[in-house]
Amino acid sequence: MIRYPAVAGQFYPEGETLVEMLEEFFRDLGEQGNSRKITAGVAPHAGYVFSGYTASRTYKAIYEDGLPETFVIFGPNHTGLGSPIAVYPEGDWVTPLGKVKIDSELAKEIVKLSKIADLDDLAHKYEHSIEVQLPFIQYIAEKAGTDFRIVPITLGIQDEDVSEALGRAVFEAAEALGRDVIVIASTDFMHYGSFYGYVPFRGRANELPNMVKEWDMRIIRRILDFDLKGMFEEIREMDHTMCGPGGVGAGIVYSRLMNAREAELLHYTTSFEVSRSTDAIVGYASIVMRR
């Protein structure tokens, strides 16, 4: 089974332009590490011109800490297709940088242990939130001279129970199979403005990005504290438009079980820095969790 790119040439460029963009994002890449303390990372999934640099901070940290055998990548299901909790079963994902192998053994074990997920490829066919993460991983893996596999999981249902079940299933599956795993939660934060039908506050154009950040930081602080319940409470209280809380929650649960002790916000920005539009402002954050 092969999954071909759905958004190459749209969310990110193809060919040499993609390589040049990645090289620019990673121009400050440090030495390859081998401490393997990172358990999970959070990265955005907008077009690279908006959020690519922020996403690169997560993968820079992973490169400098050491790459795992497998990345379990959670992304929200924007298309509504397929199973509400869909684990891609087997085969390869293709990007302009080449093929990425699915860790099918781990995928099946996660489905078995979670009791709520399905093996399903349809949910992934046109979804961009996981696809856009792969060129970053391919780039750092090539630099490191290492192979890796992935388990892509899309979420159409996102709540505490789903996060708890999936985070625990990833941990138990990795333990059972002896896998070294990092969880990646693909998410953007607040989607503000008339374009999204979400205007919980108003202000001058130059004030709005900071106001978006203030609201996002209420959630980010909960993430940095590994506070799953508190994160979802903040989201409900604000009716917040973060699109991937379920994956972030799974990363929190997995990291707790891996005895993670610290989390760090590496970078934050908004789409306003590029677009200068107040009709649609989206927050982006890079976060890593470490044991």
UniProtKB/Swiss-Prot annotation:
Organism expressing this protein natively: Pyrococcus abyssi (strain GE5 / Orsay)
InterPro entries assigned: MEMO1_fam
Pfam families in the record: Memo
Similarity section: Belongs to the MEMO1 family.
Protein name: MEMO1 family protein PYRAB05390
CDD domains, A to Z: MEMO_like (cd07361)
